[in-house]
Amino acid sequence: MAPAMTLSDKEFQKMRNWAIKCLRTIGVETGGSNVQFAVDPVSGRMIIIEMNPRVSRSSALASKATGFPIAKVAAKLAVGYTLDELPNDITGKTLAAYEPTIDYIVTKVPRFDFEKFPSASGHLGVQMQSVGEVMAIGRTFRESLQKAFRSLEVGVDGLEPKWAFEEDPDLIRARSFDLTSLRFATAFRLLKIREAFLSGKTIKEVFEITKIDIWFLNQIKMLSEQDYEETLYQLKSKGFSDAQIARNARTSAEKIRKTRIKENILPSYKLVDTCSAEFEAKTPYCYSTYDYENEIEPIQGKKVIILGGGPNRIGQGIELSLIHISEPTRPERSADGVVW
């Protein structure tokens, strides 16, 4: 996720300095690189676990999350430009030398395809087992986390167990939960953690067996403490879908949707502008959230909407993204705007 919510400023600055020292030691003079760290939350011991002296999937994620075109800037630096010579394409006023700042939360969740490998244990370790990932942006961590799980296309409407769809919410809360099922990391352990909180387990109990940072556990627990007195707007701002709200209200998603529209509870759109709205953005890269202020104006005239293929999976990869990128550039397209 970005920004890193559980790192102290001292740890952040230490990582920054070590990353630069790592690049200098290896001999990377220009171009894109990423350095990954592991931090012991008890002792504070920090080690470098990986360094990629190239543009990678992590670079693509960082570019999407911040709006800063890492690959493009790296290529220009490689041919002799300097950062203070390159304009920021999004603002048109600042330079690439300025570090991007963000006023939102970005969450990445990996996509696994264990169901296609019945013999696989499903336990996660030091080896990469994901076949793709999704990235979601929200004003809060809870909102972006729920949006990310919905985007995985694994049959969930947010951060809740799959079996919750057919059961009474009160029965779920009364269910006894076996904490030992959280001992090992699995593809859907976060869903089981929410199940544990719904069953009445405390943050301390879950932390003792998972060692997941208490900040994250507290965020998931707050999602599990959905109050029936909360307004529809408050629930939507926490990332709950109409279907999730409907199940707890014992009604249909369509009724919730109609009520939202009637009460004018509609998503607004915020800009990813690299500068936390300090300067006007020229490029319409935005995300939806539930807030009273819209930062963009609707496109006038004829529009074309391009639907993505979702997260990578076995049998569906990045080749579909190439088709989506190429399609709007066809000469016969006469739309005034393209919505991705």
Task: Write out the residue ranges for each language-model feature.
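Short alpha-helical "recognition helix" segments of helix-turn-helix
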Residues: 206, 245-246, 325
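Single conserved hydrophobic/aromatic residue that forms the stacking wall/gate
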Residues: 323-340
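Glycine- and acidic-residue-enriched helix-capping/strand-helix junction motifs
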Residues: 314-322, 326
